[in-house]
């Protein structure tokens, strides 16, 4: 369930918003001041804030500024409410980092559309970021690939990478050439390579040498 925090001193606004938003499936928390809002943020997971600009003490702009400076809440969606429809206020709001802006009195259905649009945008951004991070992780993982080699397989691989022939590897490890050939074949299978050149390249690219 999506959790929305309403920060507004107007009890009528809070009650009407809570009633409507709850009926359409949102969970709503209420706050009348910034300190109370911070307390709620620390205790509960909030997905979006609807915040009035004009409040006693710290106003909505300053609260938004604090949010954007906090690494835990810097991307938290915020919709600003105001009784003032001044262009300068909207400019300040957007520069400070609000996601949307609506003037009182407002149509609650319009606000819901704005809420859904903001949440959808943030969800898409989050999914793209997660995909990018996942791809980065997979790239790092592939560059540091771990394959379970037996001690003898690892020894053979190390010598293959050094450029030794099967006869030389056999002499070095005091085993027969036929046994070396079997180990090399196993290495091809485990690394999905087809020849010694591919095996060496694969081993070097994935840090498989010990």
From Swiss-Prot:
SUPFAM superfamilies: C-terminal effector domain of the bipartite response regulators, CheY-like. Pfam families: GerE, Response_reg. One of its GO terms (cellular component) is protein-DNA complex. Residues 3-119 form the Response regulatory domain. The keyword Manganese does not apply. Residues 142-207 form the HTH luxR-type domain. It is found in: Plastid, Cyanelle. Coiled coil: none annotated. Gene3D superfamilies: 3.40.50.2300, Winged helix-like DNA-binding domain superfamily/Winged helix DNA-binding domain. The modification 4-aspartylphosphate is found at residue 52. This is Probable transcriptional regulator ycf29. It comes from Cyanophora paradoxa. The lineage of its organism: Eukaryota, Glaucocystophyceae, Cyanophoraceae, Cyanophora. The gene is ycf29.
